[in-house]
């Protein structure tokens, strides 16, 4: 009897071990640089939140790799210059089994358009005059003015109408339509998602410091590391036999921004001098180690609204000194206040730019701020110059949001208060143009104008660097750094 009990106990222990091993095999831990601010698609303001929202929710439309819009939850037809009809697919369901219906679409967009909701997406949707539900599967959008590319603006995740009307205190969605569902999310704890098709668990663990994240990856505490991976750390991690990496050409656009309302930065000659003084080739080679490419405009040439063969400023410190001497005939250096984040790699970049500008007679004073404070001050216009990146730009309406004179905060993202009659004309002409080829040509003219006037100094497009443990299979990212490949990611059996 004693031997029999020992045998039963041993069998139970083996079963428990295998069950635990199987559970761990089906759990993948993803190291991210910051925790999401919200999983509610109406309020996404940061890249991590937007990428996670795309796992939890589905939208009426989605974007292909070329950033052209295609149907997702619904097909659409244009019934008139001011009238679009969306028909929801029969197979569109929330994870609780309820169908996605027109009232869900209506409730989601109505709430975004409510000024009291303070959704950051309201500016891109103000052209909507009315939303009408025709039946459970059909919803009509009526516009204030013609917009031939209106569907581009409808990539926001659809929420159940019941959630919109009675939201919980935390973004724990009782029903969502995406390929993943939220299991748990509490303060200072990982976000835990479950993949709907097979129940596999994915933990998203926020580790701000890239060195700490690297150590967690090496120790096996996380399986995937993506976002704010410095190139030198990426290269070092790839030396380990238990890790491998992927580098994907990205569209993260880094730039220098300026306050154009007054002071030295309002002088286009000064901005031209700064552009000629920055040796981007050296920065890309020695700091980025080849993981970024020179940028001349907001979108890369592969984007339909981008442009080939943009020839802007060159590295020419001699010309820069001549312009500076013309602006400032005294021997006293021009002082330029520059704001950047606490990210150590961004500080290294700032230090190199500071040194390059010093050689042409500009004394750049660097102010380091945490990201929230930095964004707050820039949004208020409390800066002379700064460096930031636009992440995941997709739609051509960003030209209006960033460069139109009527798009200053809070109405848009023209933080430097750039005002150009010609830029406004080109943006408005492009928005009215129904022919894609002609619209692209208008945006190309706009990009040449922006290179002349330099409200921004474009710097580079940064690649997305991902490092994984060797047993992680079928994960990659795309041009805007999305996590959508997690739909098929697995851990291999040993």
Residue map of PLM features:
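N-terminal lobe/hinge region of extracytoplasmic solute-binding protein
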Residues: 31-81, 87, 110, 175-176
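Extracytoplasmic/peripheral linker and loop segments enriched in polar/acidic and small residues
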Residues: 365-374, 401-470
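Ligand-site clamp/hinge motif
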Residues: 189, 194-235, 363-365
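Long beta-strand-rich cores associated with HINT superfamily self-processing modules
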Residues: 466-494
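Surface-exposed binding/hinge segments that line
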Residues: 5, 121-164
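Alpha-helical secondary-structure segments
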Residues: 29, 101-108, 136-140, 179, ...
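Gly/Pro-rich hinge or "lid" segments in bacterial periplasmic/extracellular proteins
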Residues: 145-203, 209-212, 318, 322
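Append "and occasionally in soluble cytosolic enzymes with long acidic Gly/Pro-rich linkers
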Residues: 183, 266-355, 360, 419, ...
